[in-house]
Amino acid sequence: MQFLDRHLTELAIDEAYEHEHSESPQKSQLNAANLHKYLSKLMYRRRNDFDPLWNQILVAGFDTSSKPFLASVDLRGTTFTSPSLATGFGAMLAQPIMRRYAATEEDAARLTREEAVNVVKECMKVLFYRDARSLDRYSIAVVTKDGVELSEDEQLEKQSWAFAERIRGYGTQTV
């Protein structure tokens, strides 16, 4: 991730320098859609050089026409876009929950900010219960046209381990 951080910082500096010294009134080309395409080419090249970056990256933001953009790129340079995305353990457990609320682009567009944050909080609770090594604290980032709002000290609410008392051994449980 440090390589990507340095590389993207250099890219942003180059972009700002070129934009500052050009006479074109054109807006910056470094938006979410272009960044995603750039990352997919970078990851694909590294894969072909037999030196892959072992990351799954989600890119969120806005494209050139100011439409919301959400896509992923993996270590092979494979790209994917969807109304909701997750990586790692969340791709297996949280993604079905998010699809319940945002199965299509239209469903996702109808979600309010509060509803979307509540869906993410529900997903984080499920992930916390299913991973013994997880913490009950997490961060949430909300991307809007005005910028990124980062809330770093979120904590799971209404935790209840009452269901654990009924679990005996492994396998199918009968009551």
Model segments located where?
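Conserved short S/T/G-enriched processing/targeting/catalytic segments and their helical context
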Residues: 1-53, 80, 85-119, 128, ...
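Short, flexible loop/turn motifs enriched in small residues
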Residues: 52-54, 65-66
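Short beta-strand scaffold segments in enzyme catalytic cores
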Residues: 55-61, 137-143, 149-151
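Short glycine- and Lys/Arg-enriched binding-loop motifs that mark or flank ligand-binding interfaces
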Residues: 57, 73, 84-86
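Acidic-glycine-rich active-site phosphate/pyrophosphate-binding loop
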Residues: 59-76
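Hydrophobic beta-strand positions in blades of beta-propellers and related beta-sheet-rich domains
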Residues: 68-72, 140, 148
